[in-house]
């Protein structure tokens, strides 16, 4: 997380120029992540993906300007972290290759376990930095407010309302319909997202129809959980439309 602002279980962000000679750590720093992904979804996917290499005890990510497209994954031991770094280096997450390094400093969770007395020192240092930043910000002049408003384009409210009502009336189904999928997003990318939810069966792309796919689960209930967890999700700048598929009559 951002070492200047985070006050809970923070780790220091390593420089992108760090090399493999960096000191190994239980905490991995990941960058080049798709920035449009919802934070809750990103954490779930990273926990699921890295969890296949061992116990993940924390996943840290923020939407602040400094931390966009980045995250930290904390393992319970160094061996698992090293295997994950080696195997997942360059792994295409949401169509973008992950760039993974050891974090320059250990997470608070690891420090608490190995050297509890250091935690209070860390907290004091962060508090001092936050207070200094506040004092510095107070000296900066406020940006002038805009004096004009941009015209709001007209919307076809009737058509939008009709479409929304029709989708809301669809009963729960173990199969989800995905629409507005970017061309570069394939079945493997969608699988990475939706297999994080219990009961996942498969992703089926629709041949000859771009931007559409189906995701099947074991039950209506599990599909509902996945639908709620991915509503509003964006990939490569496109907001993905997730609804229940129509049941065969």
Curated annotation (Swiss-Prot):
Designated name of the protein: U1 small nuclear ribonucleoprotein usp102
Region (Disordered): 1-25, 113-157
One GO cellular component term noted in the UniProt record for this chain: U2-type prespliceosome
Similarity annotation: Belongs to the RRM U1 A/B'' family.
Chief location of this protein within or outside the cell: nucleus
GO biological process: mRNA 5'-splice site recognition; mRNA splicing, via spliceosome
Organism: Schizosaccharomyces pombe (strain 972 / ATCC 24843) (Fission yeast)
Signal peptide: none
Subunit structure: Component of the spliceosome where it is associated with snRNP U1.
Protein's cellular compartments: Nucleus, Nucleolus
All residue ranges annotated as the RRM domain in the record: 26-105, 174-247
A Pfam family matched in the record: RRM_1
Key word Nucleus present: yes
Keywords: mRNA processing, mRNA splicing, Nucleus, Repeat, Ribonucleoprotein, RNA-binding, Spliceosome
InterPro entries according to UniProt: Nucleotide-bd_a/b_plait_sf, RBD_domain_sf, RRM_dom
Residue ranges with Basic and acidic residues bias: 114-134
Disulfides per UniProt: none
Entry-linked Gene3D superfamilies: 3.30.70.330
């Amino acid at each position: 997380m951002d070492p200047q602002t985070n006050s809970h279980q923070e780790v220091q962000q390593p420089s992108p120029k760090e090399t493999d000679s960096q000191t190994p750590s239980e905490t991995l720093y990941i960058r080049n992540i798709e920035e449009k992904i919802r934070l809750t979804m990103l954490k779930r996917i990273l926990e699921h993906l890295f969890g296949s290499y061992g116990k993940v005890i924390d996943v840290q990510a923020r939407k602040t300007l400094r931390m966009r497209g980045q995250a930290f994954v904390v393992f319970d031991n160094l061996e698992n972290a090293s295997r994950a770094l080696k195997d997942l280096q360059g792994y295409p997450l949401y169509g973008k290759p992950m760039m993974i390094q050891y974090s320059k400093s250990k997470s608070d969770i690891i420090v608490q376990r190995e050297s509890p007395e250091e935690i209070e020192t860390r907290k004091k240092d962060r508090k001092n930095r936050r207070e200094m930043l506040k004092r510095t910000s107070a000296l900066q002049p406020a940006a002038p407010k805009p004096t004009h408003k941009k015209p709001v384009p007209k919307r076809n409210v009737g058509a939008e309302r009709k479409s929304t009502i029709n989708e809301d009336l669809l009963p729960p189904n173990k199969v989800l319909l995905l629409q507005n999928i970017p061309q570069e997003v394939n079945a493997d990318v969608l699988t990475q997202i939706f297999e994080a939810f219990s009961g996942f069966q498969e992703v089926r792309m629709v041949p000859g129809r771009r931007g559409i796919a189906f995701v099947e689960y074991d039950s209506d209930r599990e599909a509902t959980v996945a639908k709620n967890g991915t509503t509003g999700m964006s990939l490569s700048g496109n907001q993905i439309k997730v609804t229940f598929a129509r049941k065969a009559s």
